[in-house]
Amino acid sequence: MNRRRFLQLSASATGLLALRPLVAAENAAPPTGKGASFFLASDTHYLANKEQPDAMDETSRGINTRLIEWLNKLPGTEVPAEAGGGMVGEVSGVIHSGDLIDTGDKNGAAHVAMQKTEWAAFTADWGLNGGDGKLRFPVREVWGNHDGPQGKGLVIDGLRERNSRRKEVSVSENGMHFSWDWNGVHFVNVGLVVGASKDVVRPRRYAALESLDFLTKDLAERVGDSGRPVVITHHVDVARYCAPLDPELVSKNEWDYADVAAYHAVLTKYRVAAILYGHTHVRKIFPWDGATPKLAKDAPPGKGISVFNTDNSGHFNSETQALMYFTVTEKEVFAREFATPDAWLTAAWTPQVWRFPIA
């Protein structure tokens, strides 16, 4: 059984939706007034043809082409009542939570050639600032473990160059992390994982590239005590990496629990509307108080930061894909899911709404 199938079965068995979704009858109408609306996509895994590395895999190419088409045409369309109703408004942009391509974690001449093809296809589709690719909106992406887990390589170099051209953002000194504002909401993209805590000196499996330092400084300088809502995006999930482990085992984890704890400690000083990530290829939505999330099917909603672990949006090895549509206001986060059972040939709104106040 592969990781993807294991996670799908686990999610189904546990019902990991500790933040209870609303239905239309429970005050699920979209919020009105000032706010930031945007799409969230993840795990597109652009894949080149292994036998012909300078060409894209046809399945990957088709899925991601159709994904971009859906993103472009959703604004202005109606949302059914069972998914909250209303219209999809014009969005400020699209956030992509990583694994842009598939082979950035692999070595060898053939894989390097594949990376070039995959990266060229991704940038041609997604563009950068809106209208300079097939996507008509700005994209704000982070990198995932399939893009460059050790913080080096073609995609990492490409992202650093893209960040230098990205409009209306504040970029970290190393060029890899950035923040921006959309309609009164502050957004921070912090890469693969958040770290590394200087209080714990030991090897890490993945390179954080000083994302914790950037996040700490950015929030202090650009949000401070203003009370503005904050949205954080990274790639790896917090759910599995909150609990302490034997020091001899922790370096095998994708995210060191000490870094997860340090990350949460920084966030407690601010009004965090949402944490966004992908990686698991399964949608999970829950409140996070810094501890391992409760997995019981009937777990109470509880208190904590609203975490949105979105499904894959363009993976070549799956018919089922999804993206999310958010509106974040001064007081609440309002989220819906748009999903496909057949690799974006058709798609529909999931009959649920997630609406949570910002503490």
Residue ranges and their predicted role:
Residues 1-2:
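N-terminal secretory signal peptides
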Residues 5-25:
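N-terminal export signals
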Residues 24-112:
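N-terminal active-site segment of His-dependent metallophosphoesterases
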Residues 38, 46-52, 196-198, 241, ...:
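Short, solvent-exposed loop/turn elements at domain surfaces
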Residues 40-42, 94-98, 140-144, 232-234, ...:
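Active-site neighborhood of phospho(di)ester-bond hydrolases with catalytic His/Asp-centered motifs
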Residues 50-60, 106-117, 199-204, 243-255:
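Short, flexible/disordered intra-domain loops and linkers
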Residues 103-224, 262-268, 285-335, 347, ...:
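Extended active-site neighborhood of metal-dependent phosphoesterases/phosphodiesterases
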Residues 222-242:
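Short acidic, glycine-rich surface-loop motifs adjacent to enzyme active sites
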